Amino acid sequence: LLTTCTALAATVGTGNITGVAAALAIGGPGAVFWMWAAAFLGMALAYTEVYLGILYGGGPYVYLENGVGSCFAGKCYALFCVLESLGMGCMVQAGALADSLRYAASLPPLGTGIILAVLTAVVLFGGAKRIGWTASVLVPVSAGLYLLAGGSAVFSLYVPIPEVLGNIVGGAFGLADNAGQTDGSSILNFSGISGGMTGYGMAAAIRSGVSRGVFSNEAGLGSLAVLHGMSEGKGRLRQRQEAQKQGRWAIVEVVFDAIIGC
């Protein structure tokens, strides 16, 4: 449970809000469909990376070196992981929080950064146990509030769910603007300028949906393997059983983040 909450703490968050908003702005409603599609592929990637991480006793940098036999690839991954954590893992979240507090509470971004640095240091210096405990406390509360706020917005605004789903599917495959209709009037138009705009819209939906989906659930990046690597089983058989169990939990995390949360 601690490792699952820690992994959800890394996936559920800013990517579900700013990531989805950016995907919709770039690719339209069809981007949501491709975020879901990327999540289904990401389930297999999440299971595989977590399984290998526990089997080899570490993250991708370990099984790249010991499993694949490439020490260079493992070191390259470790370097890229550090660089990725600075942007995707820290700057986006800290920047979003700083902007929110600046407008809501007139707190300068520097003050937000100092507070975040102190709180993060307190948690990190406590080791893996404190990280897991903090995640197990914060994740259920934050995820519950997020889903409650999103659900209340949908129901209070009387959003027509069937029409929204029709627009999502229609936008994903480059249908006309009336993709939410079901009378057969939504057809593909590949003639002249309209066809070019349709193809461009579909490409933008796929590109933004897949990229923002990976940004949100982190499936395939290897970070899930690092977090789940804290779970170990004694003996080769127990280790394989633990790897399979944690791999299934990784699938649940992707479903919760990308399918439910987004």
Q: What does each model-identified segment do?
A:
Residues A25-I26, Y51-I115, E163-A203:
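Inter-helical loop and helix-membrane interface segments of multi-pass membrane transporters/permeases
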Residues L124-P140, P160-L165, D183, G201, ...:
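Hydrophobic, small-residue-rich membrane helices and short re-entrant helix-turn-helix hairpins
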Residues L1-I17, K234, R238-R240:
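Membrane-interface "cap" regions at the ends of multi-pass membrane proteins
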